[in-house]
Amino acid sequence: HGELKKLESVLSQIDTRPDDVFVFMGDYIDRGPDSRGVVDRIIALGETNKCIYLIGSHEYALLHTNDEYYQFLFDNYGGPATVRSYGSFENIFKVHGDFYRNLKFYYLTDKYLFVHAGINPDYPLEEQDEVDLVYIRGKFIYSKHKLPQKIIFGHTEFDEPYIDEGKICIDLGCGKYPDAHLCALILNEDGTREFVYS
């Protein structure tokens, strides 16, 4: 959410190896002061490491502002801060249009599914509605899913990482609340995990 200093704080605490994969969970923009700087930084990281960039609810709204509903969301949930960081609405797409248009809805590995908001537990992964992938909350969080993978997600903020047997949420409200931390989750090959906070 435009919080470049918090992003830099988290990245500075991670010892990276060339074969590490960074999965960015979406909501790079809106609310915070430097949406453009955040996107520049994660694109730059992709020049030295494999990076997966997922779409968040805020990027989804940005890409659909031709629809009145999503224009309302953009205007009322931090979009003006993004416009300020780029200088104009048009500049958002001049500078980073390809980045926003190529964001992925999820990233699947043998052990994990990374997705911004979650999945609808009533449907298999290949039949998910893209709106659910970026906006779903309670139906996903408080239900068991049928996938063999553990689901790593954000979108719904908690005071600390939310962990149950099938999912982990790393959204701590960064960008929404001034004192909230940005949280990263390191998933090691041996199955251990650690959290890093700004």
Where are these regions (language model features)?
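Conserved beta-sheet core of the metallophosphoesterase superfamily
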Residues: 129-196
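Active-site-proximal beta-strand elements of phosphoester/diester hydrolases
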Residues: 1, 112-118, 168-170
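Short, well-ordered beta-strand micro-motif
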Residues: 108, 114-116, 184-188
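N-terminal active-site segment of His-dependent metallophosphoesterases
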Residues: 1-41
